[in-house]
């Protein structure tokens, strides 16, 4: 199953909340929905800044995870650090002109395996991943060894998937794809943006409101 172990990004929610839900459910053992995670991020995160920047930060994630009674943090490290720490981590990547959050699962035989909330279980070769990994940043949740779940552990089906579907299919190579294809990829991972209601005639004037838009945003 291409989306095995992944909280799939559907119903127009952000990649950040989907990636965090995937990590929490797959490594900690929670049973959260993406909406529950998003509500938690809004409640315990920096709500005004979330509205202003229209996205969730690693600090928002840290605060929500802390509210669940867990320690976590965002770090910078080398590729070797990501591999040797031997646990799943949220990592920001930038590919095909877009930025995105995915969950690092494992490194094996020169390939990096990730759980992508929009595209499923996919992989990159080592150098390609290094090229698209944003600022060498990773977000980790500290879980006692005896409590760690292995729902994100690499399985044979993940290895077969790489052979059955090339990376080109997901627009992860430096090729110029037709605009309609890029639109299709973007539409596949749409999200909602949190704004303030500026309609003075609305009973919710001045309160947070959701506007629908795409998840991916062009970096240039």
Question: What kind of region is each of these model predictions?
Answer:
Residues 107-220:
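Noncatalytic regulatory segments and standalone regulatory/sensor domains
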